[in-house]
């Protein structure tokens, strides 16, 4: 057996592993070095308006028991700008405007902790939107291309959730006289509300996939299975649900 040959081959293997490891570490270091992190706090009234226009990346909003806003962001590209502005005590973040003409600026992932009564108005082209534990006049989430929307423990007078591709989940309550609109081109829409909810529903599904479950009653009128119109209880809230290719499901919580 040629021991020298085996030793040289082992050394080559060890060298290859070492080089591979170094390249991996260099890649991770480069990625970490290019990434920016932003963390800021702003004083806020209890009914402050939060307006965020993103391009790509996740948006997470949740309430906390403080009269201030805590903004955290992870910015993928060192060339991307995030310039939050307070206007009349409201917080405006417009990534689209701040980076106009720059081309692809990568993902920017946001997390905001806000007063429970904050008005929430969110948009992104790509990425998931999650909003939790808000009681206010408005919660709006709009994904213009692809991403899921999840609204949990929401009690708002007006709710708008729209996307093109992705699922929409709403769990909360319908307020007296409130307006609620849910719309997706491709994805499932699930609405989970108390069994004693009162609302007038207009639901449309080109795929004929509408499941009202416990909320179905004889007052509903259907049109070829593609459209359902009717009242649940006294119909004091207005609910519109449109889905072009996915399922519409109502669940009782």
Regions found by a protein language model. Give the residues of each.
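Intrinsically disordered, low-complexity terminal regions
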Residues: 1-253
């Amino acid at each position: 057996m040629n021991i020298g040959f085996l030793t040289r081959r082992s050394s080559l293997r060890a060298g290859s592993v070492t080089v591979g490891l170094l390249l991996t570490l260099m890649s991770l270091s480069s990625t970490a070095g290019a990434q920016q992190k932003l963390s800021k706090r702003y004083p806020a009234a209890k009914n402050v308006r939060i307006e965020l226009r993103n391009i790509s990346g996740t948006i997470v909003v949740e309430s906390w028991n403080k009269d201030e806003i805590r903004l955290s962001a992870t910015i993928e590209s060192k060339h991307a700008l995030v310039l939050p502005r307070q206007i009349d005590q409201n917080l405006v973040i417009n990534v689209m405007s701040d980076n106009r003409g720059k081309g692809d600026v990568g993902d920017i992932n946001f997390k905001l902790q806000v007063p429970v009564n904050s008005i929430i108005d969110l948009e992104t082209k790509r990425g998931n939107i999650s909003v939790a534990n808000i009681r206010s006049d408005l919660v709006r989430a709009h994904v213009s291309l692809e991403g899921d929307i999840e609204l949990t423990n929401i009690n708002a007078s007006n709710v708008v959730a729209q996307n093109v591709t992705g699922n929409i989940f709403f769990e909360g309550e319908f307020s007296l006289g409130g307006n609620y609109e849910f719309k997706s081109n491709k994805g499932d829409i699930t609405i989970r509300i108390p069994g004693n909810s009162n609302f007038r529903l207009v639901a449309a599904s080109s795929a004929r996939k509408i499941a009202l479950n416990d909320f179905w009653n004889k007052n509903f009128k259907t049109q070829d299975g593609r459209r359902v119109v009717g009242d649940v209880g006294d119909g004091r809230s207005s609910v519109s649900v449109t889905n072009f290719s996915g399922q519409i499901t109502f669940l009782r919580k």
